[in-house]
Every structure is written in structure tokens, then in C-alpha cells.
Amino acid sequence: MHWVFHCILIILACLRFTCADTPANCTYEDAHGRWKFHIGDYQSKCPEKLNSKQSVVISLLYPDIAIDEFGNRGHWTLIYNQGFEVTINHRKWLVIFAYKSNGEFNCHKSMPMWTHDTLIDSGSVCSGKIGVHDKFHINKLFGSKSFGRTLYHINPSFVGKINAHQKSWRGEIYPELSKYTIDELRNRAGGVKSMVTRPSVLNRKTPSKELISLTGNLPLEFDWTSPPDGSRSPVTPIRNQGICGSCYASPSAAALEARIRLVSNFSEQPILSPQTVVDCSPYSEGCNGGFPFLIAGKYGEDFGLPQKIVIPYTGEDTGKCTVSKNCTRYYTTDYSYIGGYYGATNEKLMQLELISNGPFPVGFEVYEDFQFYKEGIYHHTTVQTDHYNFNPFELTNHAVLLVGYGVDKLSGEPYWKVKNSWGVEWGEQGYFRILRGTDECGVESLGVRFDPVL
């Protein structure tokens, strides 16, 4: 095991710039081991040097076990490739791997971050430095020259090649795309700061015999937009995020809206405010991206979401949080990656969670061909545009809402039905279907579950 010394801060002003879509590209193996946290008193400003009053040693073990120096046991999960969260002895630690603005990152050191008890009644500041492995690596995708201000060129032959290459789905030209720059389309697909590669190897859990037995009687198809028992649909209308990279906020709000309707038997039917998340969340980067685990999960539990009428959606990052502390908010609790930790998610668990508790956010890798999707069961093609001599549409991570699954009656292909946030004119009236059972584009890796608080 390796020693790592970290800085954990509770100051929101610092957090705003450190909590989501960083250039870090770290793995389970990087986080696994023995970490030492130095803790100090709460301060109103980020300290350059912390007067540490105590330290805590926490060991992160396989697959999701956390044990502190006193023998208390808890759990932990990697947060994509950006950091991890530990819950132990009624306290939560949010750790984001250290990085610099030039794209350098260090998987054995943290940025200033949060620690607070699970009741959010008391918080602390802690800081530290790396003991060993004090080496920064470069994420070449982050901050690379991208010609981002160039207007996107629609190449009709590219769409034609997509349709000729395969028959599972059909692409279509959306003329409005030519009005946007490459950076604006990146924002729409996840945000310029989500241009990070998915870990090549996940600490993935395969379905157990018990799980296979438990899910053996699940229906062949299920769709919350049209429940099979004829009941009301809890799925709220399609949103259009515009060119703001707020996709992480839309499915987080939509999932909470749906689950509140189900738990309350439709006695409560809020339409929540993703704009509040864009303006106020210390766990994301406004219009530059974020992750549902930190929004539907942590932000929903720590801060809650007010209704849309409080802060309507503008698709802009104002940088100012104007929400009254006294407004009614809807909260989440008991959030986690499906399966308990990042890497534990699989198809069967996703089906079970979907049917049992309602729609939930997922993330997946967006390639250039996806923006031209019109209908059918999407899978990434190897077709490349020949207009540019570089790849202008670098890989991003896009968050969406899983609402159903089924099997195509013509092709026999299994699929997930997913709600996007690009308006009703895109795809299948705002939805798309994507290949199920193969972790296509990572769609079976980032499912997030939570319970609504009523």
C-alpha cells in the first residue's frame, strides 16, 4: 500500500473550480491503498498553509471496503476517473485527484475538498501533501489545440457513410448544427472539461448466480414512458439544454422528478430547476460539465433542488447563485453507483433498479456519429469524416436518463431506451435507443441510483 496525504476543504469558493471534469485520468489501482488526511478547523478562505490539528488514516481495500486506523469499516467508490468518495464512521470524504490547469494530474494527491458528517451538521478543513509518488502526468486531450471556435461543418457524405456502413440505426442531417462552433457542440455533448478517456480497465463485477436467478423473471421489455400496467408515466417532458454543457443536471433533475412521482403516488409532481445546479453547484463546472453521481447524488443530498419556477433555465453560466435559502427544495439520499461502487454496475442490476425504483441517470461516451442519430438502435461506427485533417469532435462524456429497455422486433437486437436533453426534434422525439448488454460506449458503467426524500 502507498501513503498519500490529502487536502480536504469545505470552502465552496474553492470547490467550484476543483470538483468535476478535471484532466485527471486515474484508475482503481491508483486509489486503492492507504491514505492519510490532515484536518484543520473550518476557514472562510482557502488557506495556503493549514494548521493541522489531527490526521486520519483510511485504507481503501478491494472492492469497496474502507477501514480507518481505529478499525471502523465503511465503503468507498471511485468517481469515474476523477476522484473518489469515502463514507466511514458517519463521515463523508470527497476526494478529487490533484491537477493543474495545463493538463497535468497526480493520482496520489488530492485537491482541496470537502469532509463533513453524514448529517451535514459539521464540516472541517484539512490539507496535506504527497509522501511518495509525487509525480504529475499529462492528459494530452485536456487543453489540446482543438480549433474550437471554428463553425462545425456538416459533411453529407459522412452521414451517408454511416447509413451505408450498418443497418441498426439511421443517421440524419440536422442543418442547425452548422450554426454552432465545435466547442459549442462539445458543450452540448458533455462539456469541454469532460474530454477525458474512460478507464481502459474497470474493476467490473460480473452478475452472480443469485442475481441472474433474481432477474430471471424480469419482463423482456419495460418502458417508464408507457408503463405496461397502463399507469401514469412519471417521465417529465424532454428538455433542451442548448449549447450549455449542463447535460449532467438535466437527467439528475429528471430522475428526481420521476422518482418523487412514483414514491408519492403522483401526489407531488415538481418540475425541478437544472439552472440552479448550473449556477450554484460546488460539485460541477456550470456549462462546462459535471457528473450525475455528484449532482443527483451528493448535491441532491447536501443542497437539494428547487422547482423550475424559482430559477428558470437560461442555458448560461451566470456564476451567481441567487436561490433563496428559504425556498422549498427536494432532496436525495442513499445515492451510489448501481451495484454499490464504480465498476459494479451491470446490465442485470440496471434492469432491476429501473423496474424497482424508476428512471435513473447514466453516462456514456459521445462520438461524432451520435449527433446525427435519428432512429434505430445506436452503436458507435468506425466511419470517419473526411472534411477535417484532424478530429474536431473529441470524446466527451454525456449524461442522459435511462427510462426503459427492450428487444427490437425486426432485428432482435436488445436495447436501452434513453431520454436525451437535445429537444424533441432530435432522435426519436427526443429519445434514443442504444445497444444493450455490451456496455456500448460505456453506457452500462455509470448508472447512478438514489432515493428521493419526501
Curated annotation (Swiss-Prot):
Q: Which cysteines in this chain are paired by disulphide bridges?
A: C26-C107, C244-C287, C280-C321
Q: Which residues form the propeptide?
A: 21-217
- Localization: Lysosome
* Cofactor comment text: Binds 1 Cl(-) ion per heavy chain.
InterPro entries found in the cross-reference section: CatC, CathepsinC_exc, CathepsinC_exc_dom_sf, Papain-like_cys_pep_sf, Pept_his_AS, Peptidase_C1A, Peptidase_C1A_C
Q: What is its EC number?
A: 3.4.22.-
Q: Which residues bind chloride?
A: F291, Y337
Origin: domain of life:
Eukaryota
GO molecular function list: cysteine-type peptidase activity
What residue range is the signal peptide? 1-20
Checking CDD domains in the record gives: Peptidase_C1A_CathepsinC (cd02621)
Keyword Secreted attached: no
> Which cofactor(s) are needed, names only?
chloride
* Broad class of the protein's primary localization: other
Q: Which GO terms describe its biological process?
A: proteolysis
Question: SUPFAM superfamilies annotated for this entry?
Answer: Cysteine proteinases (SSF54001), Dipeptidyl peptidase I (cathepsin C), exclusion domain (SSF75001)
Matching Pfam families: CathepsinC_exc (PF08773), Peptidase_C1 (PF00112)
Record GO cellular component, one term = lysosome
The answer to keyword Ribonucleoprotein applying to this record is no
SMART domains in the cross-refs? Pept_C1 (SM00645)
Give the protein's biological function.
Thiol protease. Has a role as a digestive enzyme.
Family affiliation: Belongs to the peptidase C1 family.
What name does this protein carry? Cathepsin C
Q: Which organism is it from?
A: Schistosoma mansoni (Blood fluke)
